Amino acid sequence: MVMTNSPQNIGIKGIEVYIPGQAVNQSDLEKFDGIPQGKYTIGLGQTNMAFVNDREDIYSISLTVLSRLIKNYSIDTNKIGRLEVGTETLLDKSKSVKSVLMQLFPGNNDIEGIDTVNACYGGTSSVINAINWIESSSWDGRDAIVVAGDIAIYDKGAARPTGGVGAIALLIGPDAPIVFDSIRGSFMEHAYDFYKPDFTSEYPVVDGHFSLSCYVKAVDNCYKNYSKKITGDANKTVGVYDHFDFSAFHVPTCKLVTKSYARLLYNDYVSNPSKFADLIDETTRKHIDGLTYDESLTDKILEKTFVGLAKDETKKRVQPALQVPTNTGNMYTASAWVSLASLLYYVGSDNLKNKRISIFSYGSGLASTLLSVTVKGDVSAITKVLDFDYKLGDGRKIQSPEDYLAAIELREKAHLQKSFKPQGSTDNLSQGTYYLTEIDDKFRRAYAIKE
């Protein structure tokens, strides 16, 4: 079937987020790890970290979030023409997560899309692919779904409290209340900042300080490339306060996002210093202006200056997007989109009409994009389904650091196993959650649904 009318207002029509039933408090983790109080909570900006034991994997959390999207939005699965998955949590070097999810589409085998992998960026690449499919001559009139999710865990050490778990499912199509703007700015580069070369371990190899610089560099370049497509001038930014009403980010830590929003303001300063004439004293200005670009990526005076200048706007325009991430930790591919969902929920539909929201997505290695959406319709039905007050409250249990460590140890024992039955408890799984029951002698996985 050839579509005669081009689709309008392509965007997000539904969102479901899966947050596991267990989390560990970061203050408790500080005490347990014997490190100074505030290092995880103030230094990283994190409050709680979601985790799972050996009962859940990327297949199960993807099945859970997608099945709930289908149920909560009464989706006719025959009217889905594209399904794509973004993840970096790989169970198989050949078989895709998307192929596992086809169980949820009985009678509909004509569904395009596959898995997209590059660190935390795969979900965003999948979203862009969905938009482009609907805009193309290949579109058959059906909607698309993007699933993004990961289990982010680290070996013992400084990076461990920056983990997390979660998944998101997005229903994408025309005539949506949350509409994608046509402008995007991307930045891609070869970098060994975070990668997973060891298939015998779930843990990544991380160059922490370098990765932070890569993230900030990506923020700069994506913002410049986005702005250039609007202003026509490579040296002129759109103005973060003028162009965006709210901002969501990929959230490795909430503290990094606070600094990155301020970095957008720094780019506005470089673009038009005269706008900041009364805001920055001469000594500080001379210091900032004397920095090389590489020095600017890590300079503490620059950082402190613009974090201070952006403080009030950060609270209004960014903080709502951090409410969920600070309470779950990093969801990798789902992170930027859960940040958007958090913002929608905590700002509320009435305050979002005709507002533009920037979304910055970053994946190590590296791939990054700044895109934006405009809220053109009522999103109260979406925020009702999200129900973060319950999911972050009575919908889960805060466990001890000892319980968290025990869950991680179960996952270590389960990695790469066959002829295996998981040992973890299912007590904290919510109704409708998929969980692993067995891995047979050919590595085939079987699941049940919590009743």
Swiss-Prot record:
Gene3D superfamilies according to UniProt: 3.40.47.10
Pfam families assigned: HMG_CoA_synt_C, HMG_CoA_synt_N
Modifications made to the protein after synthesis: Is a probable target for sumoylation.
Functional pathway: Metabolic intermediate biosynthesis; (R)-mevalonate biosynthesis; (R)-mevalonate from acetyl-CoA: step 2/3
Entry binding sites for (3S)-3-hydroxy-3-methylglutaryl-CoA: C120, T162, S211, H250, K259, N330, S364
EC numbers: 2.3.3.10
Reactions listed under catalytic activity: acetoacetyl-CoA + acetyl-CoA + H2O = (3S)-3-hydroxy-3-methylglutaryl-CoA + CoA + H(+)
InterPro entries xrefs: HMG_CoA_synt_AS, HMG_CoA_synt_C_dom, HMG_CoA_synth_N, HMG_CoA_synthase_euk, Thiolase-like
GO biological process: acetyl-CoA metabolic process; cellular response to starvation; ergosterol biosynthetic process; farnesyl diphosphate biosynthetic process, mevalonate pathway; filamentous growth; filamentous growth of a population of unicellular organisms in response to biotic stimulus; filamentous growth of a population of unicellular organisms in response to starvation
Induction remarks: Expressed during exponential and stationary growth phase. Expression is repressed by amphotericin B and caspofungin. Expression is also repressed during biofilm formation.
Active-site residues, record numbering mapped to chain: E88 (proton donor/acceptor), C120 (acyl-thioester intermediate), H250 (proton donor/acceptor)
Alphabetically ordered keywords of this record: Lipid biosynthesis, Lipid metabolism, Steroid biosynthesis, Steroid metabolism, Sterol biosynthesis, Sterol metabolism, Transferase, Ubl conjugation
A molecular function GO annotation: hydroxymethylglutaryl-CoA synthase activity
Top-level taxon: Eukaryota
Family: Belongs to the thiolase-like superfamily. HMG-CoA synthase family.
PANTHER family per UniProt: 3-HYDROXY-3-METHYLGLUTARYL COENZYME A SYNTHASE, HYDROXYMETHYLGLUTARYL-COA SYNTHASE
Record function comment: Hydroxymethylglutaryl-CoA synthase; part of the first module of ergosterol biosynthesis pathway that includes the early steps of the pathway, conserved across all eukaryotes, and which results in the formation of mevalonate from acetyl-coenzyme A (acetyl-CoA). ERG13 condenses acetyl-CoA with acetoacetyl-CoA to form hydroxymethylglutaryl-CoA (HMG-CoA). The first module starts with the action of the cytosolic acetyl-CoA acetyltransferase ERG10 that catalyzes the formation of acetoacetyl-CoA.
Protein name, per record: Hydroxymethylglutaryl-CoA synthase
Source species of the chain: Candida albicans (strain SC5314 / ATCC MYA-2876)
Gene name of this polypeptide: ERG13
